[in-house]
Amino acid sequence: MNNSPQRAAKGFTRAFWVSNTVELFERMAYYAVFIVLTIYLSSILGFNDFEASMISGLFSGGLYLLPIFSGAYADKIGFRKSMIIAFSLLSIGYLGLGVFPTLLEAAGLVSYGATTRFNGLPDSSSRWIIVPILFILMIGGSFIKSIISASVAKETTEATRARGYSIFYMMVNVGAFTGKTIIDPLRNVIGEQAYIYINYFSGAMTVIALLAVILLYKSTHTAGEGKSLREIGQGFMRIMTNWRLLILILIVTGFWMVQQQLYATMPKYVIRLAGETAKPGWIANVNPFVVVCCVSF
C-alpha cells in the first residue's frame, strides 16, 4: 500500500526530490567555500598557515562530530523544521563570511583588490570574529549531514532505496563538482577578492534551498522519533567497547584525514608551487567527477 504523500514517478515522493535538490544546492555552497577556506583565512584575514589550518581543521572536525547530537534533535522536531533551521544558519554563516571582510576594510585594517594589503589586521583581535561565524556554519552543516540522508531513507521503499541513494550521491557529487568549478575562473577575473565574493554565491544557494524547503517540502515522517542524550551516550559506550568496530572506525578515519588534505593543504600548495594561474578547484574535482561517472554502475 502506498502511504507516502505525493508519490512521484518511479516510486519517489516529492519530499524525496526536494531533499535531493536542496542537497545539490547545499553541496555547491559548501565546496565552493571549503576548497579555498584556508586561503580565505590567510589571504583575506591574515592568519598564518598554522592558525588557518587549525581553524579549518576544528571547523571540519566539528562538522562531523555534531551530527551525533543534531541528528537526534532533528528526529525530535521533524525533518522540515530541521532543514529550515539548517539552511537559515547556513545562509547567515555564508553571508557573514562575505560581509565580515567588508567591515574589516571599513575599519581601515585591510584593503582588498586583486591582491590584499594588510594595514594591521594580522595583529588585530577583530579577525577572530571569524570563529563564531564558522561556528554558525558548523551547526547548520551538522544538521544537513544527518537530515538529508535520513530523509532519503524515509522517503524510499525497500524496492527503491538503492536507486534513491544512487540519486542522492549523484546530487552530492554534482554539487561538489559545480561548486569547486566556480572559484578558479573567478580568481582569474578579480584576483584575491574572489575568496570574498564566493561566499555570496554560497549564501545565495542556501537561501534558494531554504525557500525550496519552506514552499515545497512536505513529509509526514520522523517527528518525535529522536533519542535522548542518555540513549546517545549509551550507544556511544557500546561502540567504544566493540573493538572490531573501533578498528574499522580508525581505518575510515585515516582515509578521511588524508582525503581532507584536498581542502586543508592542497590549494595553498598548488598555488605556491605552480603560481596564481594554478587551478586547485579542478584538481579537487577529479574525485566527484569519477563518482558521478561511476555511480550508475
What does each of the following model-derived ranges do?
Residues 63, 162-187, 203-206:
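Glycine-rich segments within core transmembrane alpha-helices of 12-TM secondary carriers
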Residues 57-72, 286-297:
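Central cavity-lining transmembrane alpha-helices of secondary-active solute carriers
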Residues 143-157, 270:
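Intracellular juxtamembrane helix-capping segments at the cytosolic ends
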Residues 131, 196-215:
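Symmetry-related core transmembrane helices of the 12-TM Major Facilitator Superfamily/SLC fold
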Residues 88-124:
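C-terminal ends and interior cores of transmembrane alpha-helices
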Residues 35-51, 264-281:
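Short amphipathic helix-loop junctions that connect adjacent transmembrane helices
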Residues 1-13, 222-250:
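Juxtamembrane intracellular "pre-TM" segments in multi-pass secondary transporters
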